[in-house]
Amino acid sequence: MPFHLNKVLLRKGRLEVLPTKSKICILGLSRVGKSSLLSLLQGRDIAEEADPTVGLEIEDSVLNGRKTSIWDFGGQERYRFMWQDFLRGAGLTVVVCDSTEENIEKTKEIYGKFSRYLSSKIIAIANKQDLPGALSADQVQKKLGITTYGMSAIRLDLRGRIRRILEYEIDSNK
């Protein structure tokens, strides 16, 4: 079982981790709704046009009564070099796509590149299910080959759904 961490130190050019709590990593290409999913989970209002995440944002939450660090990775190509180091120690990795054919194919490439660094359980969120032409979660799952849940991160009525998904997947990771 992977260890869980909250803090990363850079010492003598090497990353060191301090184990303290559960860790969930959220990754995907830019503009797929990773930060919106995190805002939805945390109970914040969702901005219609959110600024892209720069590098990495880490927030704490409580899932299943346990403290959990949620790592929201910037999806721009210039930040992806950090992913392999920051994926270490995750108990759950959530791959987010925007449910379009083009994005799913690019997500599959990215996932393939970084999957060797993942020691955690991996799921996908097929976000933006509310948009015309969105592929269903089942279609996305067939293309990615990992358990996939449909979502629309801008729908406040789905706040409980993202929480239930993460809590279920964390518990089933034991």
For the regions a protein language model found, what residue spans apply to each?
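Short glycine-/polar-rich loops that comprise or flank the Walker A/P-loop
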Residues: 21, 66, 89-92, 118-122, ...
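Conserved G1/Walker A P-loop phosphate-binding module
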Residues: 2-49, 62, 68
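Conserved C-terminal guanine-recognition region of P-loop GTPase G domains, centered on the G4
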Residues: 99-145
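Short, glycine/acidic-enriched loop or turn micro-motifs at the edges of active sites
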Residues: 75-76, 101, 130, 155
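Canonical P-loop GTPase G-domain recognition
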Residues: 132-174
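Inter-motif core of Ras-like GTPase G domains
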Residues: 79-101, 111-117
